[in-house]
Amino acid sequence: MSTPSVHCLKPSPLHLPSGIPGSPGRQRRHTLPANEFRCLTPEDAAGVFEIEREAFISVSGNCPLNLDEVQHFLTLCPELSLGWFVEGRLVAFIIGSLWDEERLTQESLALHRPRGHSAHLHALAVHRSFRQQGKGSVLLWRYLHHVGAQPAVRRAVLMCEDALVPFYQRFGFHPAGPCAIVVGSLTFTEMHCSLRGHAALRRNSDR
């Protein structure tokens, strides 16, 4: 897939709905921007995996993606990723791929289907030093804004543990029932978000 213009995604003004922390402040004047949002590249894979491993293994004992899978998705579909960098340091990320079926399956964990219309969010993680600051919320809102602007993408899908269902509902996701994917003893709820509905939510937040 040709992606000549997505590797340097620039921050854009974004109105957040009530209850979600505000977007980062203005960039300070020095060499590295105080806050930068951009699509990730394979060169970012090691930093991504370091954050992911600490965030997920400490909670569930499993990583959604191993290092090879991170590199795989950042090579095939970098436009479906988004990283938040503070003074050049990666502090939070989302990695996704396209999926072409109504529901997630075991295959969806490792595949990118270029003709799909669903952005499958594989992982969202925040560096431990930057948690409890609302960064996950800001990044997810920006990500949905970003992928929703891509003509091929009609919805976002993910799987999460039951405790996280209310968090994702704040962004327009709705439970689609138990996910067919099981990881060890862990079970998940599958969540769907129409990006057309998300655009309407953005418009309402501007009022």
Curated annotation (Swiss-Prot):
Q: What is the protein's given name?
A: Serotonin N-acetyltransferase
What organism is listed for this UniProt entry?
A: Ovis aries (Sheep)
Q: What is the effect of changing residue 160 to S?
A: Reduces catalytic activity
Q: Which gene encodes it?
A: AANAT
Against InterPro entries, the record matches this protein to: Acyl_CoA_acyltransferase, GNAT_dom, SNAT-like
Binding-site residues for acetyl-CoA, renumbered to this chain: 124-126, 132-137, 168-170
Keyword Translocase assigned: no
Instruction: Supply the EC number(s).
Output: 2.3.1.87
Please give the residue ranges the record annotates as the region Disordered.
1-29
Inducers of expression: Exhibits night/day variations with a 7-fold increased activity at night. At the mRNA level, the nocturnal increase is lower than 2-fold.
Look up what happens after changing residue 122 to Q: Decreases affinity for acetyl-coenzyme A and for substrate
**Free-text tissue specificity from the UniProt record:** Highest expression in the pineal gland, followed by retina. Expressed at much lower levels in brainstem and pituitary gland. AANAT activity also detected at low levels in the olfactory lobe.
- The record places the site described as Important for the catalytic mechanism at 120, 122
Q: How does it assemble?
A: Monomer. Interacts with several 14-3-3 proteins, including YWHAB, YWHAE, YWHAG and YWHAZ, preferentially when phosphorylated at Thr-31. Phosphorylation on Ser-205 also allows binding to YWHAZ, but with a 10-fold lower affinity. The interaction with YWHAZ considerably increases affinity for arylalkylamines and acetyl-CoA and protects the enzyme from dephosphorylation and proteasomal degradation. It may also prevent thiol-dependent inactivation. The physiological stoichiometry of the interaction is not clear. In vitro studies show either 1:2 (i.e. 1 AANAT molecule per YWHAZ dimer) or 2:2.
